Amino acid sequence: RLPADSISLRTDTRVRLHHGSGHWPARIVLMEGKSLGPGEKQLAQLRLEKPACIWVGDRIVIRNWPETVTLAGGRVLDAHAKNKNLRTAAQKIFLKQRAEHHTDASKWIDSQINRDGVGKRDGVLKPSHFYPTEIQMTVDDMIASKELVQVGQWIVKVDIWNNLRTQCASEINKAHQEHPERIGLVLEQLRPLVGSVFGQQNLFEELIADLE
């Protein structure tokens, strides 16, 4: 958010990002529009010129390049964002959900699984400003409430996993009906279907185990 007594901040402005006792040069890229007016707030990406150790959820301060004026304050919503994905619909939904619920671990976990389709149980929201015990308890609660399901080392949205199981079971039944003389469907034929849902994440073995 830009303070009410500030001047407008234009996209691609070179600034200094302050976090704790450190500061780093960066360029600020606004997600929408070319400038941010006084008192306004907006999602933006900071493209750092040097690596920085900042966790997801941490508060930051943005100062002008000469470091004479504080321009804005903010919170890190995605520490590993890719430039090419900045304005995609999935990334916008992901960032807005986190911005609107910055202290709710369940919303942050949900935002990641919604965007990526899957997450590692022991890696979700790590590192971040949420305590590890809080993250694990939140995941447990989301599994207990049938929002998520754990398959092997992964956590997945229950409806997505169930839909995938149903599709795979349908393909197996179809193969039995069309070719009753065969033992069954070659399970490797299901791999592309799993890949279409989870992309590069390999949950094929977990799915086969769940179908047995």
Where do the protein language model's features map onto the residues?
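C-terminal effector modules of nucleic-acid-centric enzymes and ribosome-associated factors
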Residues: 1-212
